[in-house]
Amino acid sequence: MIRRYLRELRICEYYKNCAGGITKLLFKLHNHYRNKIGLQLGFEIPLNVFGKGLHIFHTGNIIVNENSSVGEYCTIVGTTCLGSKNGGNGPTIGNHCELGMNSVVIGNVRIGDNVYIGAGAVVTKSFEQNEISLVGVPAKVVAHKN
């Protein structure tokens, strides 16, 4: 079911970014189906937020702010929130990042490449270093990958 949702997400992004008469109709059709699957899975993921290679391991509430930006090959392990403070910009997350179960990234923060955000971590400030692990509330760097 997750694969179907991701497939529909990418199809909707394609039709949304294309200009033309029939693509609007196809977009509406696929977007309706994507939203239907998203309700069953608990996903609220706007279009054109994630780069290629998004991988989701588990169902559960995944809420993403439409002003967020996530790089390529991101992995989400379920029940994750990428949000904003008071309607502002959402987080910007680099390539090859992994978001653990129940992780939260809130506000206009920047996260580097190859970052692991641990289960239950709450990130409220920027960590632009690459290849680090973040855990805790509020999140702190606990390891540098080599």
Describe the role of every protein-language-model region.
Residues 78, 85-87, 91-146:
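Glycine-rich hexapeptide-repeat left-handed beta-helix
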Residues 7, 55-56, 98, 116:
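N-terminal alpha-helical segment
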Residues 8-11, 68-76, 113-117, 121:
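Conserved long hydrophobic alpha-helices within structured protein cores
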Residues 22-23, 59, 100:
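A generic structural signal for short
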Residues 28-73, 80-87, 103:
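Left-handed beta-helix
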Residues 1-41, 139, 145-146:
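Terminal amphipathic alpha-helical/low-complexity segments used for targeting or macromolecular assembly
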